C-alpha cells in the first residue's frame, strides 16, 4: 500500500463510519503530520510505541570494511543508526490469521 492508497482508504473508512467526507487535503495533511512527527522523534533517538501495532526504534550499525561490488575494492563503511520496526503481538497474530484464511 502506498501513501496515496493509505490516504484514500482512511477517507473511505472515516466516511463509512461517520457519514462525513473528509477533504483530500485534510487527509493528506494528517498523514504528513503523522509521518513527520514520527521521523523527528526517531531522529532525536526516541522510541515510538503504538500498542497493538508495534514499535519503532533505532539500531546501531558499527563501522565496517565493505567491498565495492563493481571493482572489488575495499571500502570503509561508516557507523550509522537505522530505523527498525518490531511488530506487536496483535499485529503478528492478525496477519498470521489473515494469511492462513487466504491460503484455504
Curated annotation (Swiss-Prot):
Species per Swiss-Prot/TrEMBL record: Neisseria meningitidis serogroup B (strain ATCC BAA-335 / MC58)
Signal peptide: none
Cited function: This protein is one of the two subunits of integration host factor, a specific DNA-binding protein that functions in genetic recombination as well as in transcriptional and translational control.
SMART domains per the UniProt record, alphabetical: BHL (SM00411)
Any GO BP annotation: DNA recombination
NCBIfam families: hip, PRK00199.1
Record-given protein name: Integration host factor subunit beta
Record keywords: DNA recombination, DNA-binding, Transcription, Transcription regulation, Translation regulation
Subunit structure: Heterodimer of an alpha and a beta chain.
InterPro entries with a match to the protein in the record: Hist_DNA-bd, Histone-like_DNA-bd_CS, IHF-like_DNA-bd_dom_sf, IHF_beta
Gene3D superfamilies: IHF-like DNA-binding proteins
Assigned protein family: Belongs to the bacterial histone-like protein family.
Amino acid at each position: 500500500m502506498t501513501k496515496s492508497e493509505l490516504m484514500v482508504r482512511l477517507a473511505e473508512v472515516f466516511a463509512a463510519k461517520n457519514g462525513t467526507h473528509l477533504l483530500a487535503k485534510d487527509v493528506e495533511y494528517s498523514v504528513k503530520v503523522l509521518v513527520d512527527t514520527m521521523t523527528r522523534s526517531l531522529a532525536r533517538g526516541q522510541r515510538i510505541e503504538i500498542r497493538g501495532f508495534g514499535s519503532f526504534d533505532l539500531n546501531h550499525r558499527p563501522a565496517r570494511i565493505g567491498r565495492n561490488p563493481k571493482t572489488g575494492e575495499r571500502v570503509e563503511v561508516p557507523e550509522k543508526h537505522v530505523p527498525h520496526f518490531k511488530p506487536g503481538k496483535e499485529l503478528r497474530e492478525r496477519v498470521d490469521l489473515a494469511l492462513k484464511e487466504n491460503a484455504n
